[in-house]
UniProtKB/Swiss-Prot annotation:
Keywords: Cytoplasm, FAD, Flavoprotein, NAD, Oxidoreductase. One of its GO terms (molecular function) is oxidoreductase activity, acting on iron-sulfur proteins as donors, NAD or NADP as acceptor. Pathway: Nitrogen metabolism; nitric oxide reduction. It holds the Pfam family Pyr_redox_2. This is Nitric oxide reductase FlRd-NAD(+) reductase. Belongs to the FAD-dependent oxidoreductase family. It comes from the Bacteria. It catalyses: 2 reduced [nitric oxide reductase rubredoxin domain] + NAD(+) + H(+) = 2 oxidized [nitric oxide reductase rubredoxin domain] + NADH. Its cofactor is FAD. Its EC number is 1.18.1.-. SUPFAM superfamilies: FAD/NAD(P)-binding domain. It is an enzyme of class 1 (oxidoreductase). GO terms for cellular component: cytoplasm.
Amino acid sequence: MSNGIVIIGSGFAARQLVKNIRKQDASIPLTLIAADSMDEYNKPDLSHVISQGQRADDLTRQTAGEFAEQFNLRLFPHTWVTDIDAEAHVVKSQNNQWQYDKLVLATGASAFVPPVPGRELMLTLNSQQEYRACETQLRDARRVLIVGGGLIGSELAMDFCRAGKAVTLIDNAASILASLMPPEVSSRLQHRLTEMGVHLLLKSQLQGLEKTDSGILATLDRQRCIEVDAVIAATGLRPETALARRAGLTINRGVCVDSYLQTSNADIYALGDCAEINGQVLPFLQPIQLSAMVLAKNLLGNNTPLKLPAMLVKIKTPELPLHLAGETQRQDLRWQINTERQGMVARGVDDADQLRAFVVSEDRMKEAFGLLKTLSM
């Protein structure tokens, strides 16, 4: 009798995989094990919950029970997997164990919290569960400090500002979105955030946090202090690799997989935010969707390599939305920036004048698909 496929995790990657497997095989045994409730929600919505006035429970799209019934699954929510015996093909928790033929790690990534004194006062918004734990504090907060000016930090800064809160954003870099694009490209969004009232503290460092009678005192470099009611860490994600490491799998930044999503163990695969595909960590929806389609085929006996096209990344800042694609972080590109009242098109070209990256904003986002075709040629 087949032990089937065991998936550790219940986020977007795990659900996409289940849906793709069930399109091809209605009966192969599927077991999902996860530490959370396994209810479905749309994670990108977390960037807009405050301005939308949404509670954590409002985000639920489908309960775990409904998901299990729809796709013929065995679910084990609120269950911590403690160990994987790769040789015996067994996954273990404190009170249970499961045999598998094929195992998929879809353990996601956790929010990185800077190691400063008082770090326990920082909140993270990387899951519905995390938002549920702090939603009252965030709703009641008048003054909010966001640590990190990357994609999530910029989205949250705009959202909290739109909700009428006094927002300060701090980052070591000289510009926002510094790991994604050069300052001459991100400056349009940076200017818009400033216009809205976001206080940007760039080239600045958080040194510590301390609880006071009236809030939280944040100590910064250059002998500066500000008092706020809530502090959110938006300083990036770290792939969850501890379980894979204990199982003896090859780990780098994430769980290392090849083009077939296979780890260093032939019967164990990794997918989503925890996976490092041929040296790349790709924590975005489109590569996860494409990876899930390929992995479903491979788990069912095919041998299909993952081929990723040029893909759009969307920055959900409603007052000035951005789409980007290609190697926007490359240092050697020349940027041709066309700015008009209705939006911006920035093209990054190499020494041979080949388009290697682009960023488009506002009404000019409709030009993204034409540029994407050029990028893919």
